[in-house]
A protein has these predicted regions:
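Structural preference for beta-strand elements that scaffold enzyme active sites
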Residues: 59, 94-96, 120-122
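Structural alpha-beta junctions
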Residues: 55, 85-90, 116-122
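A cross-taxonomic marker for long C-terminal extensions/tails that follow the last structured domain
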Residues: 2-5, 9, 111-125
């Protein structure tokens, strides 16, 4: 299995997705493309493949400035896949949710995910 690197588009409508087999997963930028599924699906598939032989620890760093409703569903899919690995004790998963000091919307979004996903979250401003 190889690392996954999905670069943002030149218009800044898709996020950087940089997933390392070592267990460090990064999602950064903005996610506002209407058909964002095409951008996120390789990441979901990659995580599902990783679950067959995961590293002992996985850290998901989410540093998004903004994301739309379609993106939120894809983020939830990623979190659910990681939750499965965590609950089955295949890997210890931690989510670091970054938000700007004055960005209460992103803080609320992180809290919403934290309330429905059984993973440890660190809210970092």
């Amino acid at each position: 299995m190889n690392d996954l690197l999905l670069k943002p588009d030149f218009q800044g409508k898709t996020p950087l997705i940089d997933f390392k087999v070592s267990g460090v997963l990064n999602i950064e930028g903005r996610s506002i493309l209407e058909n964002i599924i095409d951008h996120f699906q390789p990441a979901v598939d990659w995580i599902n493949n990783l679950s067959t032989c995961p590293p002992p620890t996985i850290t998901l760093n989410i540093k998004l400035e903004y994301f739309n409703t379609r993106s939120s569903k894809m983020i939830l899919n990623i979190l659910k896949s990681l939750e499965g690995m965590h609950l089955s004790k295949k890997s210890k998963v931690t989510v670091n949710w970054y938000y700007g000091d004055d960005d209460l919307d992103m803080l609320e979004a992180g809290n919403d995910y934290q309330s429905i996903i059984k993973l440890p979250f660190n809210m970092i401003s």
